[in-house]
Amino acid sequence: MANTPEPLTTEAAQVVSETDLGAAKLLEPSALWLEPYQWVSVAMLVLIAIMLWKKVPSLVTGGLDNKIAEIKAQLDEAKALRAEAEKLRDEYTAKIANAEKDAEAMMENARHEADAILEKAEADSKALVERRKKMAEDKISAAERDAVDEVRATAAAAAAAASRKLIAEKHDAEADRKLADEVIAEL
């Protein structure tokens, strides 16, 4: 520890005592028989008198009154703005509630419309299936009729051809005469 401070040593303390052994008394300055504290009081009274004469308190109170009026106006404006904000908040809250109700009503209406469309589509599809089924049945019955008519026509043609062949084979001119005579006799 190379840099340690050394303690300060002084000479032996000397005792000094004060005694009032006829020392002269200190006189304070005075002017016009007034002490300094009295002059301070007079100066303050003069300052206050000048302030009152120049109407400083009324200026201060007027300034304070103006500031109070300004603050009151700001407070009134703030109250009006707050009331307007609360009114707008209530209005928008009501609008949001109405919008939610409208949205719910729209959703309910959309559900009903979707159900109605679904029911109509089911009914239409059933009707379409029935129509197609009837058309198929009609086509089948028409095809059956055509087939029956064709079979009948073929059978009639075959019967006529067979009859002609049989008549041609078994009937001769004499048999024709005999048949014609019988038919005439019946008439």
UniProtKB/Swiss-Prot annotation:
Keyword Transmembrane helix (UniProt): yes
Pfam families named in the record: ATP-synt_B
Sequence intervals crossing the membrane: 36-53
The keyword Cell membrane belongs to this UniProt entry's keyword annotation: yes
Subcellular location field: Cell inner membrane
Molecular function terms from GO: proton-transporting ATP synthase activity, rotational mechanism; proton-transporting ATPase activity, rotational mechanism
Keyword line: ATP synthesis, Cell inner membrane, Cell membrane, CF(0), Hydrogen ion transport, Ion transport, Membrane, Transmembrane, Transmembrane helix, Transport
InterPro entries: ATP_synth_b/b'su_bac/chlpt, ATP_synthase_B_chain
GO cellular component term, pick one: plasma membrane
Family stated for the protein in its record: Belongs to the ATPase B chain family.
Subunit structure: F-type ATPases have 2 components, F(1) - the catalytic core - and F(0) - the membrane proton channel. F(1) has five subunits: alpha(3), beta(3), gamma(1), delta(1), epsilon(1). F(0) has four main subunits: a(1), b(2) and c(10-14). The alpha and beta chains form an alternating ring which encloses part of the gamma chain. F(1) is attached to F(0) by a central stalk formed by the gamma and epsilon chains, while a peripheral stalk is formed by the delta and b chains.
Role: F(1)F(0) ATP synthase produces ATP from ADP in the presence of a proton or sodium gradient. F-type ATPases consist of two structural domains, F(1) containing the extramembraneous catalytic core and F(0) containing the membrane proton channel, linked together by a central stalk and a peripheral stalk. During catalysis, ATP synthesis in the catalytic domain of F(1) is coupled via a rotary mechanism of the central stalk subunits to proton translocation.
HAMAP family with a match to the protein in the record: ATP_synth_b_bprime (MF_01398)
PANTHER family: ATP SYNTHASE SUBUNIT B (PTHR33445:SF1), ATP SYNTHASE SUBUNIT B', CHLOROPLASTIC (PTHR33445)
Name of the protein this chain belongs to: ATP synthase subunit b
Organism: Erythrobacter litoralis (strain HTCC2594)
Lineage: Bacteria, Pseudomonadati, Pseudomonadota, Alphaproteobacteria, Sphingomonadales
